[in-house]
């Protein structure tokens, strides 16, 4: 297993991936991933900013992480080497699948800087399930916040201030840095946390964050 070098690692090493850099990247795919909250630009898009829900939609069967992930009923540890860890996603949709015809008229894809709402709308139309994700906190003007989760859950943060480019997440004293948020990947995977954990979110400016 190789450490990530570029967005074209998949082409380099010969495996399919959701990430790519190409001068001929189709704008439709770029726009779609952007609406879901993933990193995107004029000639590139990537898995950054994805959730377990979008991983399922895009048939992402394996996730390479540079940190150990908590045990989950959604994915299994598969392999690890030299600080890189491979996880198998247990629940993925096929590459092609049917959707409700109502999606053309009812799917909300223009929710500014909130791919979570777009994902909720997608699942509601196609499955009838409301609020796959539920908002539990809102921090409008804070540059740094500290909270203890009120329940055990897998949590994500959505950073809506377009001027905020770097956020650190500190869980029980261990810090993770997320940068390049101005590329559109404004969903931060906090991970699975419990009521015993301490979580600190800190941005390089006010975050206008939802959790």
Q: What is each PLM-predicted segment?
A:
Residues 20, 54-211:
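Flexible, solvent-exposed extracytoplasmic
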Residues 13, 27, 33, 99-102, ...:
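Surface-exposed beta-strand edges and their flanking turn/coil or helix-capping segments
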Residues 6-19:
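Short acidic/polar micro-motifs at solvent-exposed secondary-structure junctions
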Residues 1-5:
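Conserved small/polar residues in nucleotide/adenosyl-binding loops
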Residues 6-7, 25-27, 83-86:
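A short acidic, often aromatic-flanked loop/helix-cap motif at beta-alpha or helix-coil junctions
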Residues 17-57:
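Luminal/periplasmic acceptor-recognition loop/helix of membrane-associated glycosyltransferases
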């Amino acid at each position: 297993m190789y450490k990530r070098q570029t967005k074209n690692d998949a082409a380099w090493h010969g495996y399919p991936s959701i990430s790519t850099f190409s001068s001929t990247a189709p704008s439709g795919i770029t726009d779609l991933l952007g609406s879901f909250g993933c990193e995107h630009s004029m000639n590139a898009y990537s898995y950054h900013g994805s959730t377990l829900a979008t991983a399922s939609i895009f048939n992402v069967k394996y996730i390479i992480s540079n940190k150990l992930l908590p045990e989950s009923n959604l994915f299994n540890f598969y392999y690890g080497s030299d600080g890189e860890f491979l996880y198998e996603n247990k629940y993925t949709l096929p590459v092609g699948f049917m959707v409700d015809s109502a999606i053309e008229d009812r799917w909300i894809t223009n929710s500014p800087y909130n791919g979570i709402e777009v994902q909720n709308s997608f699942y509601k139309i196609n499955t009838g399930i409301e609020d796959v994700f539920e908002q539990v906190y809102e921090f409008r003007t804070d540059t740094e916040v500290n909270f203890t989760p009120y329940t055990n859950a897998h949590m994500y943060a959505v950073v809506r201030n377009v001027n905020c480019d770097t956020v650190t997440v500190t869980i029980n004293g261990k810090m993770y840095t997320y940068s390049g948020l101005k590329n559109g990947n404004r969903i931060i995977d906090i991970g699975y946390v419990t009521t015993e954990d301490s979580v600190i979110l800190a941005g390089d400016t006010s975050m206008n964050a939802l959790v």
